[in-house]
């Protein structure tokens, strides 16, 4: 790359390296970031403009709630990068501009994932999809959803309906792809286009199916970058060139992200790892006297504000799975470099400080990459903000850095990937608790009585025998792993074909790592059920057709969540065993198998789909979220509960292990300083035990009960659920009750 005057000016004062000639954002960061080990005294409060704009956002949020959850919606124009004119909150006050349509809070219509879903989303809120648009995407332009259902087998459809596999991204955008939006700020769009053209022209000329597909994808990526430049022009910016200062760097990066969410409505549209990158520009401008600390914070606050108002039109079925209108604009903060230097900067503080300046909020999904080696002042600040807002999640950087290096980000909730070098095929999750019931009933569904799994004689004994049950369970997991992977192969083939993420992939290297991100639900239910069968006496109760529909338990049994190796080892074995079975099946585009123990809020849906289980859980009752112990069963205090979850091996769950943890304030200590110190010590201990992820809620149950009864008094009450945060008042009452029923630890 020949450095133009634009590049020379934009990069003035930066240490040079390979990144000057080639795309290498990581090297740019490592050469130029400034470690900050001080405290939070430098932080600035909100400016008048920030307060005015946030008041406007809160008023729009109030109006949206009053209108039933939808402020306005586009029913005619299919959303693309350039489909809508520029939109503003207040053009004269905003330091960072850009919204998804021509108005803030107006939701776009995105039909490429499925016209039926677009129509259902409209109708759910009293809107009507434009008939001509519906005709186009029904008769002339096939969608992802239609492609998937054209290819599904009857077996797959039966599994989907029964809920032994559910939440599949066949009726919504898959998401969980992180474009390296930093590249637009550092290099400008023109250089990125040059690189894609170069890759296209140097590809193999042996026209295999793989080569043909990649050539078409590269062409689409190139066109999307042209559209991105046009989006910049709509807002008055020339983003063909690199950003020359901090304000431009934030704006350029945000426009790249905005382009992605204008074109895709994936279940998780995550941001990446931007705070340390942007701090390099802020520090240069501060050192040169071109900007003040207050101006830097104002720009960050306005950036965060934009990320808070990302919105998609969703169907009621989607909202059952992922409740509370989440978008998973996940920003990964902190961590430690492979050279041992913490990557904490002043911007790490500024991003978290937005929780003070704007108040708590679920988005962006602020994720601290925790290491025992983070600066102590930053640890204390994180703890303080967690106790104050319950808006932060923590993920073990010491664990992930070994696999992903020091320039990875978190997609959605707990899924690590190298920024710009790796993407995943999101796969929802298989229901291990229901699979156990299928093993007992010879493949018949315990709720419908239909033959869904492979047919064999159900267990006939009057008392369940552990060895007999487990032998059949293993066979059922063999079958489930196969139908699961095959379903995902269809889904992602069709998503690439009919709803390709061209802009997000344009901000990746051309040659990337792909993972097939499977998942499991009901781990604690399955582990406790097997523990009950092994250590107590479990008698199956059959209906008139001989189907086991309930269980009678005599005696006690070890329960997952109490640091009891007898049952914890069952949970570990299930995870390792199912992952081995998944790996035996070929994946689309030779993607690497990964797995998560994560449910989002679909633990409620899974519970509805699953009958009585041998652990004593009743039909329809919610599962525990993620890798959590079942509600109320972790009775030996916070540390024992954490110890059980920390045993789940990350090596076979590299898509993440979610643990949502609630503790009452007094159990952390009487004084603020003690609470902060105790929480950081707990996080350090969990990290040293190889625990992967921790959502932390610090509040009393009574607060949530009051918010249920008086939602108007709690417009910004934020809680952490399985892998994300949510406005508590946006949950359904059923989900609110589920949250309230969970364990609130009153002792360490």
UniProtKB/Swiss-Prot annotation:
Q: Which PANTHER family match?
A: FORMATE ACETYLTRANSFERASE, FORMATE ACETYLTRANSFERASE 1
Origin species:
Staphylococcus epidermidis (strain ATCC 12228 / FDA PCI 1200)
**Record keywords, A-Z:** Acyltransferase, Carbohydrate metabolism, Cytoplasm, Glucose metabolism, Organic radical, Transferase
Q: Where are the disulfide bridges?
A: none
Q: Sorted alphabetically, which InterPro entries does this protein's record hold?
A: Auton_GlycylRad_Cofactor, Form_AcTrfase, Form_AcTrfase_GR_CS, Gly_radical, PFL_dom
| Lineage of the organism | Bacteria, Bacillati, Bacillota, Bacilli, Bacillales
Glycine radical PTM sites in chain numbering: 723
**Gene that produces this protein:** pflB
NCBIfam families with a match to the protein in the record: pyr_form_ly_1 (TIGR01255)
Which ranges carry the PFL domain? 5-618
- Where exactly are the transmembrane stretches of this chain? none
Q: What is this protein called?
A: Formate acetyltransferase
């Amino acid at each position: 790359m020949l450095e133009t005057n634009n590049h020379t000016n934009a990069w003035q004062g930066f240490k040079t390296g390979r990144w000057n000639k080639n795309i290498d954002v990581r090297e740019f960061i490592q050469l130029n970031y400034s470690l900050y080990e001080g405290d939070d005294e430098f932080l600035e409060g909100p400016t008048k403009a920030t307060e005015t704009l946030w008041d406007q956002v809160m008023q729009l949020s109030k109006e949206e709630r009053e209108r039933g959850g939808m402020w306005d919606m586009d029913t005619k124009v299919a959303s693309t990068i350039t489909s809508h004119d520029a939109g503003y909150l207040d053009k004269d006050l905003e330091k960072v501009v850009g919204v998804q349509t021509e108005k803030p809070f107006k939701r776009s219509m995105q039909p490429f994932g499925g016209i039926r879903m677009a129509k259902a989303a409209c109708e759910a809120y009293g809107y009507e999809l434009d008939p001509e648009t519906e005709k186009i995407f029904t008769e002339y332009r096939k969608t992802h959803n239609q492609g998937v259902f054209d290819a599904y087998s009857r077996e797959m459809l039966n599994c989907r309906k029964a809920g032994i596999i559910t939440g599949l991204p066949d009726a919504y955008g898959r998401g969980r792809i992180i474009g390296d939006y930093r590249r637009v700020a550092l290099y400008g769009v023109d250089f990125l286009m040059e690189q894609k053209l170069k890759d296209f022209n140097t590809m193999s000329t042996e026209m295999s199916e793989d080569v043909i597909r990649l050539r078409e994808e590269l062409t689409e990526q190139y066109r999307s970058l042209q559209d991105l430049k046009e989006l910049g022009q709509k807002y008055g910016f020339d983003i063909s060139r690199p950003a020359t200062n901090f304000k431009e760097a934030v704006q350029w990066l945000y426009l790249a992200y905005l382009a992605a969410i204008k074109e895709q409505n994936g279940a998780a549209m995550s941001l990446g790892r931007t705070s340390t990158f942007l701090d390099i520009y802020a520090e240069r401008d501060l050192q040169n006297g071109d900007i003040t600390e207050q101006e830097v914070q104002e720009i960050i606050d306005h950036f965060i504000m934009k990320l808070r108002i990302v919105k998609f039109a969703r169907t009621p079925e989607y909202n059952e799975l992922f409740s509370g209108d989440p978008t998973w604009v996940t920003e990964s903060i902190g961590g430690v470099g492979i050279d041992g230097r913490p990557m904490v900067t002043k911007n790490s503080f500024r991003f978290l400080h937005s929780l003070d300046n704007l108040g708590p909020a679920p988005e962006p999904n602020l994720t601290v990459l925790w290491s025992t080696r983070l600066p102590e002042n930053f640890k204390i600040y994180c703890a303080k903000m967690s106790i104050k807002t319950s808006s932060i999640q923590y993920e073990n950087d010491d664990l992930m850095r070994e696999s992903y290096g020091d320039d990875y980000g978190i997609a959605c909730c707990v899924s690590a990937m190298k920024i710009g070098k790796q993407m995943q095929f999101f796969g929802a999750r298989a229901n291990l608790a229901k699979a156990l019931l299928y093993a007992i009933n010879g493949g018949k569904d315990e709720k419908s009585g239909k033959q869904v799994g492979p047919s064999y004689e159900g267990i006939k004994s009057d008392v369940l025998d552990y060895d007999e049950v487990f032998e059949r369970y293993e066979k059922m997991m063999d079958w489930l792993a196969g139908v699961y992977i095959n379903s995902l192969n269809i889904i992602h083939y069709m998503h690439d074909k009919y709803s390709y993420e061209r802009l997000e992939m344009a901000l990746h290297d051309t040659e990337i790592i792909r993972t097939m991100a499977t998942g499991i639900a009901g781990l604690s239910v399955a582990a406790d059920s097997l523990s009950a069968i092994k250590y107590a006496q479990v008698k199956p109760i059959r209906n008139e057709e001989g189907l086991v529909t309930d269980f009678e338990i005599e005696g006690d049994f070890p329960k997952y969540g109490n640091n009891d190796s007898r049952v914890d080892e069952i949970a570990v074995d299930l995870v390792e065993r199912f992952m081995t079975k998944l790996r035996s099946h070929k994946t689309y585009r030779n993607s690497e198998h990964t797995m998560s123990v994560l449910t989002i809020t679909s633990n409620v849906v899974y519970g509805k789909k699953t009958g009585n289980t041998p652990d004593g859980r009743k039909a329809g009752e919610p599962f525990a979220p993620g890798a959590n112990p079942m509600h109320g069963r972790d009775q030996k205090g916070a540390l024992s509960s954490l110890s059980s979850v920390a045993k789940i091996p990350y090596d076979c769950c590299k898509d993440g292990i979610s643990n949502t943890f609630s503790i009452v304030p007094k159990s952390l200590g009487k004084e603020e300083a003690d609470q902060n110190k105790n929480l950081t010590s707990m996080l350090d201990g969990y990290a040293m035990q190889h625990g992967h992820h921790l959502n932390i809620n610090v509040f009393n149950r009574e607060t949530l009960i009051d918010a249920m009864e008086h939602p108007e008094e709690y417009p910004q009450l934020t809680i952490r659920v399985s892998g994300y945060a949510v406005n508590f008042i946006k949950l359904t009452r059923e989900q609110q009750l589920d949250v309230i029923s969970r364990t609130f630890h009153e002792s360490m």
